[in-house]
Structures are given as C-alpha cells and as structure tokens.
Amino acid sequence: MQAIAKNDIKTGTVVDLTHEGHGVVKIDRFPIFIPQALINEQIEYKIIKVKKNFAIGKLLNINTRSENRVAPPCIYYERCGGCQLQHLSYEAQLEMKKEQVINLFQRKAHFDNSKINDTVGMTDPWRYRNKSQIPVGKNEQNEVIMGFYRQRSHDIIDMGSCLIQDSQHQEVMNEVKSILKDLNVSIYQEQLKKGLMRHLVVRTGYHTDEMMVIFVTNGKNWPQKNAVVEKILDAFPNVTSIKQNINDSHSNVIMGRQSITLYGKDTIIDQLTDSTFKISDQSFYQINSEQTEKLYNKAIEYAQLTGNEVVLDTYCGIGTIGLYMAPHAKHVYGVEVVPSAIEDAQQNATINQCNNTTFVCGKAEEVILQWKAQGIKPDVVMVDPPRKGCDETFIQTLLTLEPKRIVYISCNPSTQQRDALLLAEKYQLEEVTPVDMFPQTTHVETVALFNLK
C-alpha cells in the first residue's frame, strides 16, 4: 500500500458516502473519509489524521463536481455543526438515507426479502424545527453570543439566523441577545463553571402558533427576570408561556429538573391531525411536526387497525402515537418509565376525550407481563425506543407475548437493525420506510413492520 502520512496532499475519486455524509476515497482499499466530498467527484485533499484502519482528509479542491452538489444557502454552514448535508441536493439526500437503510438491513443483516421503501421527504425541507436549544456565551471581546456549536465542540458560533429552525425562534434569539446585553445579565462560562444564563430554549406549536420561551439558568436567583419578561412580551405579545429552568449541574445536560413559570401557562398546545397535545418545557415531542404526521400515518397503515384491536404502546412518552391510534383501536395500553411523561399522557387522553386508553408508569418488560397476567393480550405492539434501542430483556418478553404485528419506530436504524435480528426468531420483517425527520442532516428515522411467522 502507498505510504499515507499526515499533511500529504493527494488526489482521488470519491467512491462512497458514510452514514455521516463524508466522502470516501480509497488507496489500495484503505479508506480516507473527507467531509463535504460527494460520490464520483475527483478531488484534491489533505491528510489531517491517520489511524490504523482509516484516515481523515480535508477537501482542498474539486476537479470534477458531482451533479448532486448544490451551493449551501446558509452562511454559517462551513462552521456550524447543526447541518451536514446542505451541499447535497435534497433529492440526493433522500436517496442517501434510503441507501443507508438498505445497507443496514439487506447488505449487512441479510433481510433480503424485506422491502425498503423510498425515503418520505418534505416539500420544503427548511424551517421545520419546532424546538430550538440555543447556547449562550461570550466571545473574546466579552460580548454576548448566541447560536449553535461548531461541529464536535462546545465552541459557540454566533449566528443571526438558522435555516432549519422556525423563523420565529431566530427573531426571539436575536431579541434575547439584545436584552441580555442591555440588562447586563450574567452569562454562564462553561470552562469556569460560573455565570447565570446558559441556554435559551424556544418551543412552538406547529398548528397552533403557541410559543414557549425558556431561560436555562445556573441557579435560581435572577435579579433581572421581571425586566426580561416585560421586554419579551413587548417584542412578542403572542408568547404563551415564559419559564425559567434551573440547571446548576455543570454537565452537558441542557435542562435541569426544576422549572418556574414566569408568565402565562405551564404548557403550550399543539395538534397532530385530529389529536391535541399539551407540551411542557421538559416533554419529549417530535421536532418536525409535518413529518411526524407522515410517520404516524405510516405506522397506522402498518398496524392495520379495524377498531377491534388491543394496542400496546411501549416507550409511549406523552402518548402521541398511542392517542393517534386510539380512534382506530379497541383499547390502547401505554407504558413509559418517566413519571412526568405518563402524567402528560393521561392529561392528553382527557383533552382528546379518549376513554379507551390506559397509561402506566414503569419498565415496559415488567408492566406488559403484569398485563399478560391480567389476561390482556395485544394484537399490535408499538415500539418507539430512544437511540440506544430496546433492552434485550424487553425483546425477549415481547417474543413470549407473540402479538400479531409489531410496528417499530426508530430514530437510530443501527439499533433497530440489531433488534430486528433478535425479533427474527419469531417475526418476519416485512418492510421498512425511512422518514426524513431532519432534512439537511445525516439523521434518518424509520418505521418497520414485523409480522408473526
């Protein structure tokens, strides 16, 4: 193999894209990963890091451009870590995400008879985030800065706009930056673990336009809070709720456990099709409401509900998917390990007048065995776990339960593929549909249908 050393300048043709969107050039089968390089491009690049099994390169010049390359519309794209694919046409982004799923399920796991559908995309793949989490800091000139982190760092890129956030959120961000400066509010400095203001979080109801503004502070004492609230309401009279969240943990976790309502309601309301949901500052709620409706509609299609089925909604959160399915089912049982989420789910069931739902707090693998002992046998099980996927104990419990169908929603196809191999003992993976919940990024969500053999 050719010698490869740091700072070498080389040329080559990009032959593949990684799941992180990096171009792959190979030298005698040795891969070099190059951010922002695209398949079939002939490029010049510099080796910046060499490892045992791969190297990292920096793109210097593009000698032959891909037909899928586009000019990134965001002026911060080269520095900000929020997006990874703005230089790739949206049609090619959707195809890349489908290829990622094909690679996981067919090429690696050999689910050769399982159908992989086209990625479900957006008509307008911008301004889709209904929640913004914006770090606050100071620059070298001691000026207040707000924006998003540089890739793989905690260096804040001071930004005036973000093309994937709700446009109202950037208006709030810019106003808050001015308010913090004018009122001389103490700013948290991560390295020193001193200062007050840590993050600004903004949540918006996609269909209702209700807005919640949350200030995350390093401690409860905040002398200027009344003045800040007054200025926010002067600038944005449509704000429904203003809250202070207290996080003095000095960790990477954005929000703490205690929140104080400074103005308005404790929650905001949003709708998904015909269902209404209360959302608190801490609630898990899908970031992209438009795509969530498409995702849930596909899940209902897979569930094949006629009104006579018992549905078990595991990892149910605030009850979004369970309540979405309730009008089409005989009864929905939801289980979630987070107590506050179950409280939200029960309130959401009341709001939606769903009398055919039961929500219980506990570990799914334990609660479903209790339900089994009570004679409750689900026809369909909904699974929507966090990125780490399902606990193996839960999978084994599910296999003993033997529902007719399992509908598995995942925000991490890699762990979904791992779990699919365990489910294959008794279930046939019929098909997988990728859904583009986060355009311009490498993330892809999937919904899969498993039928009992």
From Swiss-Prot:
Q: Where is the signal peptide?
A: none
Q: What is its EC number?
A: 2.1.1.-
The UniProt entry annotates the active site at 411 (nucleophile)
- What EC class does the entry list? transferase
Task: Tell me which UniProt keywords the record has, alphabetically.
Answer: 4Fe-4S, Iron, Iron-sulfur, Metal-binding, Methyltransferase, S-adenosyl-L-methionine, Transferase
UniProt xrefs under Gene3D superfamilies: 2.40.50.1070, Nucleic acid-binding proteins, Vaccinia Virus protein VP39
PANTHER family membership: RNA M5U METHYLTRANSFERASE (PTHR11061), TRNA (URACIL(54)-C(5))-METHYLTRANSFERASE (PTHR11061:SF30)
Which family, according to UniProt? Belongs to the class I-like SAM-binding methyltransferase superfamily. RNA M5U methyltransferase family.
- Protein name as annotated: Uncharacterized RNA methyltransferase SAR1988
Annotated organism of origin: Staphylococcus aureus (strain MRSA252)
